[in-house]
């Protein structure tokens, strides 16, 4: 089963706390072979479904960023969980192939 996640580029100057209140989780896409990282936002409901279906550093995820016309294979590199609430706080994707 292939997992596909659609993300948006994070708006310049946006505060992570405000994004979370709006129902988005901040995320980063780290490049393959030293490419620059990209700041993203993912819908919180999509993140919850993703975490139920994917294992960190094991499950391949097709990531789609329409604003940048980028689609590629990634793995979930890291998930930060809020210590008190137990909800996802930040996620990191690692590109596994050139996108």
Curated annotation (Swiss-Prot):
Role played: This is one of the proteins that binds to the 5S RNA in the ribosome where it forms part of the central protuberance.
Encoding gene, per UniProt annotation: rplY
Keywords: Ribonucleoprotein, Ribosomal protein, RNA-binding, rRNA-binding
Record note on quaternary structure: Part of the 50S ribosomal subunit; part of the 5S rRNA/L5/L18/L25 subcomplex. Contacts the 5S rRNA. Binds to the 5S rRNA independently of L5 and L18.
Similarity-based family: Belongs to the bacterial ribosomal protein bL25 family.
A single cellular component GO annotation: ribosome
Any one of the GO BP annotations: translation
Any matching Pfam family: Ribosomal_L25p
Keyword Ribosomal protein: yes
One Gene Ontology term of the molecular function aspect: 5S rRNA binding
Name of the featured protein: Large ribosomal subunit protein bL25
Entry keyword Chloroplast: no
């Amino acid at each position: 089963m292939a997992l596909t996640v659609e993300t948006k580029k994070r708006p310049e100057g946006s505060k992570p706390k405000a994004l979370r209140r709006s129902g988005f989780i901040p995320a980063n896409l780290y490049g393959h072979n030293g490419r620059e990282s990209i700041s993203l936002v993912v819908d919180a409901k999509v993140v919850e479904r993703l975490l139920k279906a994917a294992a960190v550093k094991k499950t391949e995820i097709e990531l789609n960023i329409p604003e940048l016309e980028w689609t590629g294979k990634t793995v979930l590199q890291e998930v930060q969980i809020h210590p008190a609430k137990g909800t996802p706080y930040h996620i990191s994707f690692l590109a596994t192939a050139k996108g």
